[in-house]
């Protein structure tokens, strides 16, 4: 498989960095951040199978490395943890990555490690009046993982710019509120909640549609004109430079987890349910999602430049990358990203 060979070269390149680095002690612990939903499935498989621990052992780091997993509700809090040095690897959308890349170019230089997956995000509602985003009014409230900063918030602005004109890109922002995916679904399904709409990712987006009266207003792939990365992994340049073996081991483990998901979808679904304790979908429902061709687990970024260019045009980031690879470490530059 061409992509698999390319990713193998990624790992080889990372280990080349290891061999050229001067001998020094690397970190004794690594902290990785997950979010809610199957967008975190690669990390969940890594955690369950202890793939990172195995890769670290094989890398001969020279000192024990403890692996810690933490969970965040969105990219904003994750970015704070990266800035404070409390987080080694973040897992969040293209928006949070672009924000950090532009913000830290002159200091800690946060960059993308790889993409995690591409999945359609759905804006669902229980309001029968709302068939397009033009039907939203002040009476509506839209839940998403982070107002203004989450990938869902940015995609909503892109859709608004297309529907109402570029100068009206923020028209729907006052209707948005920050909630985790699980809490957003709970509010949407509660008839007495002021939150009547939810912009979210699988499995929550599909599970919501199983309930009577819920329908989809917008699909992120429609906004982007094709597949788009849901989550990326990112870290600081300093972490990569000072911990080359630990960094290379991460890439190796992440590649293994990605290949496992693509080859063993039912087992991956079981692992997700076992680790996450998520009650929003059954095993069979998860397998159906994982078999959906629109849901792809790939380390190659997709559709990132459309999001990042919009962010730059509207002042969300001060500098715009010329190509997607400007935001990512060189180990993945050979992948077919967009």
Q: Where in the sequence are the language-model features?
A:
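Pocket-lining segment of extracytoplasmic ligand-binding domains
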Residues: 182-274
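Conserved C-terminal helix/tail region of periplasmic/extracytoplasmic solute-binding proteins
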Residues: 311-338
């Amino acid at each position: 498989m061409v992509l698999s060979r390319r990713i193998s070269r990624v790992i080889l390149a990372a280990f080349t960095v290891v061999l050229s680095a001067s001998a020094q002690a690397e970190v004794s612990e690594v902290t990785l951040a997950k979010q809610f939903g199957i967008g975190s499935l690669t990390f969940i498989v890594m955690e369950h199978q202890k793939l990172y621990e195995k890769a670290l052992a094989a890398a001969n780091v020279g000192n024990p490395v403890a692996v810690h997993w933490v969970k965040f509700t969105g990219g904003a809090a994750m970015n704070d943890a990266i800035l404070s040095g409390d987080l080694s690897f973040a897992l969040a959308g293209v928006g949070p990555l672009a924000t950090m890349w532009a913000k830290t170019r002159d200091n800690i230089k946060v960059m993308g490690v790889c993409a995690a997956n591409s999945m359609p995000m759905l804006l669902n509602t229980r309001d029968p009046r709302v068939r397009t985003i033009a039907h939203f009014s002040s009476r509506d409230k839209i839940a998403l993982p982070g107002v203004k900063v989450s990938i869902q918030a940015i995609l909503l602005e892109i859709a608004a710019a297309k529907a109402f004109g570029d100068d009206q890109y923020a028209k729907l922002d006052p209707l948005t509120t920050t909630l985790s995916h699980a809490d957003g679904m709970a509010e949407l399904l509660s008839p007495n909640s002021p939150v009547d709409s939810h912009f979210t990712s699988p499995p929550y987006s599909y599970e919501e549609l199983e309930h009577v009266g819920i329908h989809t207003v917008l699909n992120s792939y429609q906004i982007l004109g094709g597949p788009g990365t849901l989550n990326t992994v990112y870290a600081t340049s300093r972490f990569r430079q000072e911990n080359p073996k630990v960094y290379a081991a991460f890439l190796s483990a992440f590649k293994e987890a990605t290949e496992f998901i693509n080859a063993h979808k039912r087992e991956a679904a079981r692992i997700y349910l076992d680790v996450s304790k998520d009650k929003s979908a059954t095993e069979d429902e998860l397998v159906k999602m994982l078999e959906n061709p629109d849901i792809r687990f790939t380390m190659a970024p997709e559709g990132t430049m459309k999001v990042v260019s919009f962010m730059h045009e509207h002042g969300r980031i001060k500098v715009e990358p010329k190509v997607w690879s400007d935001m990512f470490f060189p180990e993945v530059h050979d992948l077919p990203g967009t």
